[in-house]
Amino acid sequence: MKQLLLDIQPAPVPSLENFVPGRNTEALFSLLQAATGKGESRFIYLWGAAGSGKSHLLRACEDLARQHGIRLVTADNVHRLSDDAQIDLFNTYNRLREEGGVLIAAGEAAPMQMQLRDDLATRLAWGLVYQLHPLSDAERAQALTAHALERGMKLPDEVVDYCLRHLRRDLPTLMATLDALDEWSLTAKRPVTLPLLRQLLQLPLNID
């Protein structure tokens, strides 16, 4: 059989709408309010494990704030900031507090649990602080099934189970794989099945 190089298209532009909330509904609502200028709290800090959606949410809020003309600053991976960068963020916080604006920051742990300057950690903890909980397997499965339905694709349970067991577990990768599987199904003129998925995964896949 002819080998095909299937391009798995880049994930959609991050938005609050295409973020699967799981147990993070309250955080999502607060971010929406802040990024549109409707929230009482202008300072939000998100923390959680890699793949929990922190960067997705920061980028989504940046875009939303631009649309609404809101002055918003984001700071990702604050646990990696150098001493000078921490001072800059501290000064930015104070400036936004005095002049108006929104700051949304994110890191791997709660502010007081990281090796940050005391003054910066205190500032970050003053606002709303949310731990982002990763999706459960059931929630990931629901998200994949919904994504498949949007494409008019009938997705067998065994395909979902295989994806969750053998692929990277972040949603962009999982959904991009489903998109490629849908294209491969049309190319091969075969229904979506587990054998077809295994065949797809034998091909060189471009996921960049």
Where does each model-flagged region fall?
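Dynamic helix-loop-helix/coil hinge segments at AAA+ ATPase domain boundaries and subdomain interfaces
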Residues: 4-26, 162
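Phosphate-binding P-loop
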Residues: 33-41
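Walker A/P-loop nucleotide-binding motif
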Residues: 40-57
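Conserved P-loop NTPase "ATPase switch" module shared by AAA+ and STAND
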Residues: 68-88, 92-95, 99-107
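Short regulatory helix/loop adjacent to the ATP-binding pocket of P-loop NTPases
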Residues: 111-125
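Conserved AAA+ ATPase "sensor/coupling" helix adjacent to the nucleotide-binding pocket
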Residues: 127, 142-154
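Conserved AAA+ ATPase "SRH/arginine-finger" region at the nucleotide-binding site
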Residues: 127-139
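C-terminal helical "lid" of AAA+/P-loop NTPase domains
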Residues: 161-165, 172-186
